[in-house]
């Protein structure tokens, strides 16, 4: 029984003591005046009576009632029922308030819905009303009884009833009611009233009335669920409302939802205004505040605000509320909606039932609570299986094994449940409900008996609803045990009674009368026996064992039974000594141990062997067992939620090996490197589990004790069904019946058990925390956890062990003892903290605890001494036999810098090679060594998996390609030990992820890293491999410091420039023009097969030439013999001018070769000779160059042979220049600055470029289409990878907008091609200038339209670099993706934006090609002119000129545009230490990728193969060759790279030029040759450029683990496999089939294409027959010629040959092509694309415009037509080449003169186009001409390009040839 009310208080308005405008509450009377002993009077109650503040009102308000809740220091709640009414204020109160208000002049707002006194509003005579409050204070929550009782007292006062108030209040204070048990009590206060009080059946269940249902109505399902999760996860929750009763109900409802958990933080349903600062508390709370104070809550950053009146919940951004785990979240939501809105289920029915039964509000309230009760039962199902009974007597001590619970439920990663289990509410839940013998309630029954039903009902909503309604009935019955209740009879005041004038204020009560009544009742209570209802205590049922909240079916472990069998077999082999069998199974076991079941199986199997006394192992067995244990532990988290570490803990202290007599090493010394051992929670859970086992054994009968101890989370075994909780329950039941002595004995036994376990665990912890070598600092560095625990467990402790230990190791004192003591001290502190915690919680006496603190240091010290002997003996063990190191194959001249360091090559993020789910053998991890040479980083080794152990794994990359080096800590795949490692990433798309073997010291690893860094970034370019290679074979250049031996390099370069100047002068004086020597690059010898190649140089007369062979040695250092070979050769081929401007023919040439930059005075990054307009003088170029960045002024680099348009390149414009010129609105002033004159010179220069174009020269500067023939407008291009005849080459309406990426009038096609209308506009610019958009912003167009500025947006070098880094990570990821799938690779590839940059480059290039093809010249001047400019102009030339698509032409293109024009290879490749900070920028690689994309779309247009591009991509960063070193020709000359000393090439030396290497290799193998090469004449390529048309280059993704990268040919080509008959085994012939692993084998070698295979076979057969082997090229040429002849006789060749696709006519007539029309994309499938019925009108127009040569190439004619006249003529080769006899064919049909080596040849050596012939005249014999021939037999053919010298066998023949040629010319 308990008092219904403890205190009655009368509180009235009183003035504020500090004189403020507001009043304050004053307690007028309280009863009883003396505090109850068991319940003192709550302080500050007057604040809660008027939460909004005590204020006077101008009118009488109706009475109000609410219940405030106060919490005392013992967490007991006191309910304060407050009934407030208003009485006329006394004059003194009114006057005081008015004076204060007038003084302060503060206007008070309207608060709480009441109108307050304003200082100016009321007249002095106006009546004010003061509040007065009747308060009941009780520890019981009977709101309705309080409302009725206080209402009765108020009614007696207002209505003036003849009832004594003192008697009523006295009866109220003396009324007692039962606490619980479902009893019913009728009470009367002596005023003719009657009230019935019902107590709930179970006091543990909260009473909610309708509060939960109201809360859901106010806020909705989602908001209430958010508040529910917030309260459970300890967030701050604030309710706002204008109603105090609503606030109280909302808080009550939220607490009712939390059952069975009790909220243990600040709980204030109604917070007074004076206490609002409580909201800033750092602890969680649930508080209600009047909505009038909402403004004061705005600044609270971490408070969740629920506005009950507005129905909103506001969650701050900084607050994260973890949601319920799925599927519980969605299930709960759906059930709640069924309860709250039952009509929702029927809304879509065609025939809904006429009526739906809706629950009453009270019943709905219980249904909602039932939903949450089910939710908690599902969340906490099986929690009793994770309780540890630590003590039973004198009081139960229960602990919860959180990790095991989370692991068993499969919710380790769930944030919500983790926070709930860590919260204070759950701690209270365990201590309250974990007790095994206590009264049970509805929740206990639900968890124990209804779990199976809930799981079965999950997918049946109606069954769930039925269960909810059943639970709701029980909850309702608990609150209302007697449904038929007699009605209350209580006097209420009449309506509007508050408005009646009350004759007098509330009277002062007689304290004596009330006290007397209270005393009388107390005396009666003392005499009567206490009516205590006995609690019905029972054993709490545990319920079924827990299951995962969501069954996760993983397909990876479908065959788990087989995996477990493998584990068992392996362990059996180990213990039976079958080590070879065990070794074979070990990799499979280690893979299986990733699964939980296999790890448990391992622990169980090892446990069985320990029980069989088989724990002492030999060395090999010990190593195997330790390795498997380490593998098990490596995936254990610090929580050990699956109990693996717990199961292994007794085993690691059992398995051992004998090192020597008396010295034994246990397994624990080898498994310490795991984080779980340094986690206090793990040790506590282990300790409590073992204590429970021993406590249980203490009380079991001896026969029952035989059963093995149950494992946490497992069901009890059949032998013993009594769990520790059952035993504890039985003992608690018997405890009162035991004698005092027996009780004391049991308490002593339990304490001894706990104490002995504490000693045992102190030993165990020292085993696993002390390292074998206590002087090693690595243990503590890696066990930062030990130190963190010191600071985490006690915030006052600042000297964390990590800090102190690290400090002691950093200071190399040299005292091992001091360091050892530090390790020992750290471990002692860790163990002592553990002992303190567990012993205090387990109730161990202080004496025992002190004894433990004394023992721990001794335990640690003794163990350290034992370990010293173990460590000493373990060092004497013979080392484990490691695999023999495999030596890598080295290049000639490559030397080892660091010999092999043993490492493990680990799998990275690529799936290939790692086996597993990706399939294939597990080539990685591999065990071997890493070698560092002067050229490469090489790993060679063998897989650790013995099933593939015979394969050699090689992974390497050039040192120069290293882009990132990163230290990592990884676990070695064999021993599972944490080791230091390195991750090396290279720009050749290779990754070495290595873990150093334990035998490799940290010093060796650091030395490797430093040496690698030194080789990667040498201080000078001469220290690179390309320079050091072969230096021993060739005499070295004199070093800089030795001046007596020869001039320094700097002197040499000065002499060189000086000699160049002399040579230039001499050439001008003697009117001799510069001519390049024979075709070679930069000091390389002429290839042998190039001597008779046709050369189109523009020499005037052979007699005026200066042969380079006649130059003196000093002159050979001049520019003329060093630099311009590639450039000049190409310029002469293109007909772009001659060196001397004074030659007779030069005046008619539009361009000339200018030597103005011979000394690199104008621009150091340009070549020495440049092409400029004929009319521009050299002295003007200096001024022009000032307008451009880096002085890179516009120079011509290519001219279209058809449209004669030129392509120019330059750097970006400076501010002054064309931009400044066009921006200026006014004419320049008379005193022009130097910049202005430069701008004028620049304008003249551009005008000269425009004037030099034939089609514009006649137009007097006006840009018209006069003279521009329709032939020039015809398309000579090809789209995509299909040849079409139905397209027109269209230019956009606005070229500038198209190049800038804007779609003007014509949108581009879907596949990336430009728009296609045939739209040449009436007037076009002669010159388009492409520049950066930012640079050309706001520039006006040229009014004369001679040139047009085209601003375009291009990427910068830094964007290329950033994109490349992302591409590297996408193609070669360092670690596996979180969700490995093709989509993740494609997503990361897209994020890199690499293909977008390729798309932009191709798009710009194709548009420039169109402009050039239509006759407009283009100047590309982007950035500084050496990166993106180079990419664009190179691509444009490649697409426009078929010559550059040959091996020779591509080499020339790279030499000219990339090397001579100064692309900064060393800067972009970070070749030296100076460039380290800038990093690698793959500009050239990006260009190669673009070429690769074009090659894919036009496979028949390129002479070279895709491998050639990869080869260049690899070696342009490898620094093996000198070709791609340094940033310009100037630097190469300065270093002496462009010449070689006489005699330097004697003997066999390594190739220094990549081109020389390619030439040598091409003679031996067709690897660089494209068999599909079959070009068309004058073909212009227009590739599609959309990202969807682009492919990822396989150079980025392919790998060959068998031999490493295949680009060092000498290394990649291993010895061929012996033929079958030569194999040594003499058994039956084996199959020659073998498995080809794409990531291991080189597929081109393992599966060569048919042509390569046949060529190899041919060479092999020739060798076997003893014949001299024919070169593959000669064989291939003969085969192609034979194929052409096969199709000639009837013109209908059949595809009977292997090479049918190479002949052009076959390719055109037999292929099926896609043909695209100008509108849309029409598909035309035909056998002859030229006679296609789908050809459009525009296609016909275009076909009509074709040049004759293109038309003739499309069909084959009879022999006579093709060969009008033929015979032998002697022809003089190009400059300095001899006369040679050739077979010439005059072809009238094709209007050309072809010549062949021999009459039978089908491949012509050269062609002279008769359209270019200007005259045929008699010639004169020259040096080297045939001696016996008549002088009149010589004649010359003069073309626009050069003069050809011919000699017939006799005079008639010569005359015949002249007549025939003249006849052809006249016929044309």
From Swiss-Prot:
Residues 91-123, 1067-1116, 1268-1318, 1606-1631, 1723-1757 are annotated as: Disordered. Residues 1762-1866 form the PH domain. Pfam families: DENN, GRAM, Myotub-related, PH, SBF2, uDENN. GO terms for biological process: protein dephosphorylation; spermatid development. The modification Phosphoserine is found at residues 1121, 1747. Residues 204-337 form the cDENN domain. It is found in: Cytoplasm; Cytoplasm, Perinuclear region; Cell projection, Neuron projection. Residues 1088-1101 have a biased composition (Acidic residues). The modification Phosphothreonine is found at residue 1138. Transmembrane segments: none annotated. Residues 7-185 form the uDENN domain. Residues 1103-1116, 1282-1291, 1745-1757 have a biased composition (Polar residues). Residues 881-969 form the GRAM domain. Residues 1723-1740 have a biased composition (Low complexity). Expressed in neurons within the frontal cortex, in neurons of the deep cerebellar nuclei, stellate and basket cells of the molecular layer, and Golgi cells of the granular layer (at protein level). The modification N6-methyllysine is found at residue 1223. Residues 339-440 form the dDENN domain. Keywords: Cell projection, Charcot-Marie-Tooth disease, Cytoplasm, Disease variant, Guanine-nucleotide releasing factor, Methylation, Neurodegeneration, Neuropathy, Phosphoprotein. Residues 1121-1597 form the Myotubularin phosphatase domain. The C-terminal domain mediates interaction with MTMR2. Heterodimer with lipid phosphatase MTMR2. Interacts with SBF2/MTMR13; the interaction seems to be independent of the coiled-coil and PH domain of SBF2/MTMR13 and independent of MTMR2. Interacts with KMT2A/MLL1 (via SET domain). Interacts with SUV39H1. Acts as an adapter for the phosphatase MTMR2 to regulate MTMR2 catalytic activity and subcellular location. Promotes the exchange of GDP to GTP, converting inactive GDP-bound Rab proteins into their active GTP-bound form. May function as a guanine nucleotide exchange factor (GEF) activating RAB28. Acts as a suppressor of autophagy in neurons. Together with its binding partner, the phosphatase MTMR2, plays a role in dephosphorylation of phosphoinositides critical for autophagy initiation and autophagosome maturation. It is linked to Charcot-Marie-Tooth disease, demyelinating, type 4B3: A recessive demyelinating form of Charcot-Marie-Tooth disease, a disorder of the peripheral nervous system, characterized by progressive weakness and atrophy, initially of the peroneal muscles and later of the distal muscles of the arms. Charcot-Marie-Tooth disease is classified in two main groups on the basis of electrophysiologic properties and histopathology: primary peripheral demyelinating neuropathies (designated CMT1 when they are dominantly inherited) and primary peripheral axonal neuropathies (CMT2). This is Myotubularin-related protein 5.
């Amino acid at each position: 029984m308990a008092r219904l009310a403890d205190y009655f208080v009368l509180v009235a308005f009183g003035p504020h003591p500090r004189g403020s405008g507001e009043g304050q509450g004053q307690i007028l009377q309280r009863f009883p005046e003396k505090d109850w002993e068991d319940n003192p009077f709550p302080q500050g109650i007057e604040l809660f009576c008027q939460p909004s503040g005590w204020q006077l009102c101008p009118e009488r308000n109706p009475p109000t009632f609410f219940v405030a809740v106060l919490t005392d220091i013992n967490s007991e709640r006191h309910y304060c029922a407050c009934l407030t009414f208003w009485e006329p204020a006394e004059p003194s109160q009114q006057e005081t308030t008015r004076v204060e208000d007038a003084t302060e002049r503060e206007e008070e707002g309207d608060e709480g819905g009441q109108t307050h006194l304003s200082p100016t509003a009321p007249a002095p005579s106006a009546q004010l009303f003061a509040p007065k409050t009747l308060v009941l204070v009780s520890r019981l929550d009977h709101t309705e009884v309080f409302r009725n009782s206080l209402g009765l007292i108020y009614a007696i006062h207002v209505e003036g009833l003849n009832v004594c108030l003192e008697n009523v209040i006295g009866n109220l204070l003396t009324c007692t009611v039962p606490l619980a048990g479902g009893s019913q009590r009728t009470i009367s206060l002596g005023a003719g009233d009657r009230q019935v009080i019902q107590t709930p059946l179970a006091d543990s269940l909260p009473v909610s009335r309708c509060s939960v249902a109201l809360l859901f109505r106010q806020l909705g399902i989602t908001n209430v669920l958010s508040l529910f999760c917030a309260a459970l996860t300890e967030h701050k929750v604030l309710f706002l409302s204008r109603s105090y009763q609503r606030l109280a109900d909302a808080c009550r409802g939220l607490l009712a939802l939390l059952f069975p958990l009790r909220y243990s933080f600040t709980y204030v349903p109604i917070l007074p205004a004076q206490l609002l600062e409580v909201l800033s508390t750092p602890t969680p709370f649930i508080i209600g505040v009047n909505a009038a104070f909402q403004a004061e809550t705005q600044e609270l950053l971490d408070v969740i605000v629920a506005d009950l009146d507005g129905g909103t919940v506001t969650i701050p951004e900084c607050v994260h509320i973890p949601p319920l785990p799925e599927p519980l979240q969605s299930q709960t939501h759906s059930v709640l909606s069924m309860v709250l809105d039952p009509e929702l289920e029927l809304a879509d029915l065609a025939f809904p039932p006429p009526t739906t039964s809706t629950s009453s509000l009270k019943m709905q309230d219980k249904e909602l609570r039932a939903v949450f009760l089910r939710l908690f039962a599902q969340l906490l199902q099986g929690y009793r299986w994770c309780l540890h009974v630590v003590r039973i007597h004198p009081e139960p001590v229960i602990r919860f094994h959180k990790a095991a619970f989370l692991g068993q439920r499969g919710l380790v990663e769930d944030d919500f449940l983790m926070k709930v289990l860590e919260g204070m509410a759950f701690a209270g839940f365990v201590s309250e409900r974990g007790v095994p013998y206590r009264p049970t309630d509805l929740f206990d029954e639900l968890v124990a008996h209804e779990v199976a039903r809930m799981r079965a009902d999950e997918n049946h909503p109606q069954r769930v609803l039925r269960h909810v309604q059943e639970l709701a009935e029980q909850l309702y019955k608990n609150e209302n045990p007697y449904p038929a209740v007699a009605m209350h009879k209580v006097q209420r005041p009449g309506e509007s009674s508050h408005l009646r004038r009350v004759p007098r204020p509330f009277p002062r009560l007689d304290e004596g009368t009330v006290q007397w009544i209270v005393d009388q009742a107390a005396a009666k209570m003392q005499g009567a026996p206490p009516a205590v209802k006995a609690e019905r205590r029972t054993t709490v049922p545990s319920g079924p064992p827990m299951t995962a909240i969501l069954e996760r079916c993983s397909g990876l472990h479908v065959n788990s039974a087989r995996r477990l069998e493998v584990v068992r077999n392996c362990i059996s082999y180990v213990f039976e000594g079958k080590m070879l069998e065990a070794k074979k199974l070990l990799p499979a076991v280690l893979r299986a141990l990733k699964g939980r079941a296999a790890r448990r199986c391992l622990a169980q199997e090892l446990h069985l062997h320990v029980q069989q006394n088989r724990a002492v192992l030999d060395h090999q067995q010990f190593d195997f067992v330790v390795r498997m244990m380490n593998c098990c532990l490596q995936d254990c988290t610090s929580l050990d939620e699956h109990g693996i570490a717990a199961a292994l803990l007794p085993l690691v202290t059992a398995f051992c090996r004998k090192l020597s007599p008396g010295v034994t090493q246990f397994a624990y010394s080898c498994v310490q490197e795991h984080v779980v051992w340094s986690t206090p929670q793990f040790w506590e859970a282990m300790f409590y589990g073992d204590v429970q086992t021993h406590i249980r054994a203490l009380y079991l009968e001896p026969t029952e004790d035989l059963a093995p101890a149950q494992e946490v989370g497992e069901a009890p075994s059949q032998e013993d069904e009594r769990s520790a909780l059952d035993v504890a329950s039985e003992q608690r039941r018997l405890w009162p019946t035991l004698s005092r002595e027996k009780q004391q004995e049991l308490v002593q036994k339990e304490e001894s058990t706990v104490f002995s376990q504490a000693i045992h665990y102190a030993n165990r912890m020292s085993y696993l925390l002390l390292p074998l070598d206590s002087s090693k600092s690595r243990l503590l560095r890696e066990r930062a956890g030990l130190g963190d625990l010191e600071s985490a467990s006690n915030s006052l402790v600042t000297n964390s062990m990590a800090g102190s230990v690290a400090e002691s190791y950093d200071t190399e004192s040299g005292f091992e003892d001091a360091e050892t003591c530090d390790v020992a001290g750290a471990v002692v502190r860790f163990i002592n903290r553990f002992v303190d915690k567990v012993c205090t919680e387990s109730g161990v006496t202080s004496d025992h605890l002190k004894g433990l603190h004394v023992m721990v240091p001794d335990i640690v010290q003794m163990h350290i001494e034992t370990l010293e002997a173990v460590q000493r003996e373990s060092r004497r063990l013979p080392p484990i036999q490691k695999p023999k190191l495999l030596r890598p194959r080295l290049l000639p001249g490559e030397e080892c810098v660091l010999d092999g360091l043993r490492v493990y090559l680990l799998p990275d993020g690529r799936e290939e090679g790692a086996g597993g789910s990706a399939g294939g053998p597990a080539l990685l991890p591999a065990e071997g060594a890493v070698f560092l040479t002067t050229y490469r980083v090489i790993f060679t080794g063998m897989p650790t998996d013995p099933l593939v152990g015979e394969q050699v794994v090689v992974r390497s990359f050039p040192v120069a390609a290293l882009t990132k080096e990163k230290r990592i800590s990884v676990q070695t795949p064999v021993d599972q030990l944490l080791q230091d490692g390195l991750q090396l990433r290279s720009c050749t798309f290779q990754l070495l992820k290595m873990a150093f073997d334990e035998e490799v010291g940290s010093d060796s690893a650091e030395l490797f890293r430093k040496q690698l860094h030194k080789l990667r970034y040498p201080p000078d370019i001469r220290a690179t491999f390309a320079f050091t290679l072969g230096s021993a074979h060739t005499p070295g250049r004199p070093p800089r410091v030795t001046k007596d031996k020869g001039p320094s390099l700097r002197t040499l370069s000065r002499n060189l420039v000086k000699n160049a100047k002399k040579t230039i002068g001499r050439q001008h004086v003697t009117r001799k023009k510069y001519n390049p020597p024979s075709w070679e690059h930069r000091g390389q010898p002429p290839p042998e097969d190039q001597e008779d190649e046709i050369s189109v140089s523009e020499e005037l007369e052979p007699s005026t030439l200066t042969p380079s062979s006649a130059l003196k040695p000093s002159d050979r250092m001049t520019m003329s013999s060093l630099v311009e070979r590639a450039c000049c050769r190409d310029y002469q081929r293109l007909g772009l001018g001659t060196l001397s401007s004074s030659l007779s023919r030069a005046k008619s040439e539009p361009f000339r070769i200018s030597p103005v930059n011979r000394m690199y005075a104008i621009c150091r990054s340009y070549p020495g000779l440049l092409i400029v307009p004929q009319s521009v003088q050299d002295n003007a170029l200096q001024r022009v160059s000032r307008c451009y960045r880096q002085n890179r002024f516009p120079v011509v680099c290519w001219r279209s042979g058809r449209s004669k348009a030129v392509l120019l390149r330059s750097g970006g414009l400076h501010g002054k220049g064309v931009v400044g010129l066009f921006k200026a609105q006014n004419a320049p002033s008379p005193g022009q600055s130097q910049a202005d004159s430069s701008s004028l010179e620049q304008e003249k220069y551009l005008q000269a470029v425009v004037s030099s174009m034939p089609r514009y020269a006649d137009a007097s500067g006006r840009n018209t289409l006069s003279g521009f023939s329709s032939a020039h407008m015809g398309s000579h291009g090809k789209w995509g990878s299909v040849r079409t005849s139905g397209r027109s080459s269209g230019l956009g309406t606005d070229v500038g907008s198209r190049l800038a990426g804007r779609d003007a009038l014509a949108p581009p096609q879907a596949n990336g091609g430009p728009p296609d209308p045939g739209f040449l506009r009436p007037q076009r610019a002669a010159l388009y200038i492409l520049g950066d958009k930012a640079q050309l912003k706001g520039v006006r167009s040229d009014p004369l339209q001679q040139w047009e500025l085209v601003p375009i947006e291009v990427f910068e070098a830094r964007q290329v670099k950033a994109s490349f880094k992302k591409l590297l990570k996408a193609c070669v990821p360092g670690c596996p993706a979180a969700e490995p799938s093709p989509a993740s690779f494609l997503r990361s590839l897209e994020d890199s934006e690499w293909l977008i940059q390729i798309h932009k480059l191709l798009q710009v290039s194709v548009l420039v090609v169109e402009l050039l093809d239509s006759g407009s010249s283009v100047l590309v001047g982007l950035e500084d002119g050496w990166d993106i400019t180079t990419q664009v102009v190179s691509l444009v030339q490649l697409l426009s000129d078929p010559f550059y698509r040959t091996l020779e032409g591509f080499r020339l293109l790279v030499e000219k545009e990339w090397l001579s024009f100064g692309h900064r290879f060393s800067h972009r490749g970070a070749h030296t230490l100076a460039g380290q900070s800038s990093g690698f920028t793959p500009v050239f690689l990006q260009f190669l990728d673009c070429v690769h994309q074009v090659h894919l779309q036009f496979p028949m247009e390129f002479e070279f193969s895709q491998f050639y591009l990869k080869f260049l991509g690899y070696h342009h960063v490898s620094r093996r060759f000198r070709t791609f070193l340094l940033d310009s020709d100037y630097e190469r000359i300065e270093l002496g790279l462009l010449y070689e000393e006489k005699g330097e090439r004697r003997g066999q030396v390594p190739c220094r030029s990549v081109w020389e290497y390619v030439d040598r290799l091409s003679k031996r193998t067709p690897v660089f040759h494209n068999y599909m090469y079959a070009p068309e004449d004058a073909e212009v390529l227009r590739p599609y450029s959309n990202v969807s048309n682009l492919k990822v280059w396989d150079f980025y993704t392919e790998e060959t683990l068998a031999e490493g990268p295949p680009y060092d040919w000498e290394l990649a080509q291993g010895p061929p496999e012996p033929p079958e008959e030569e194999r040594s085994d003499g058994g039956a012939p084996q199959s020659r089939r073998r498995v080809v692993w794409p990531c291991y084998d080189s597929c081109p070698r393992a599966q060569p294409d048919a042509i390569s295979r046949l060529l190899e076979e041919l060479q092999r057969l020739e060798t076997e027959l003893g014949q001299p082997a024919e070169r593959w090229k000669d064989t291939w040429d003969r085969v192609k010629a034979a194929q052409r002849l096969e199709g000639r006789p009837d013109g209908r060749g059949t595809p009977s040959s292997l090479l049918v696709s190479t002949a052009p006519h076959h390719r055109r007539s037999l292929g099926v092509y896609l043909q695209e029309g100008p509108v849309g994309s029409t598909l035309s499938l035909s056998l002859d694309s030229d006679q296609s019925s789908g050809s459009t009108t525009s296609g016909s127009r275009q076909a009509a415009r074709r040049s004759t040569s293109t038309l003739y190439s499309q069909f084959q004619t009879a022999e006579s037509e093709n060969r009008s006249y033929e015979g032998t003529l002697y022809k003089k080769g190009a400059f300095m080449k001899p006369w040679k006899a050739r077979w010439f064919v005059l072809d009238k049909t094709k209007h050309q003169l072809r010549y062949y080596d021999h009459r039978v040849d089908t491949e012509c050596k050269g062609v002279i186009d008769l359209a270019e012939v200007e005259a045929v005249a008699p010639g004169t014999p020259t040096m080297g001409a045939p001696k016996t021939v008549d002088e009149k037999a010589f004649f010359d053919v003069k073309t626009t390009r050069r003069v050809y010298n011919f000699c017939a066998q006799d005079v008639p023949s010569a005359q015949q040839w002249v007549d025939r040629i003249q006849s052809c010319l006249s016929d044309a």
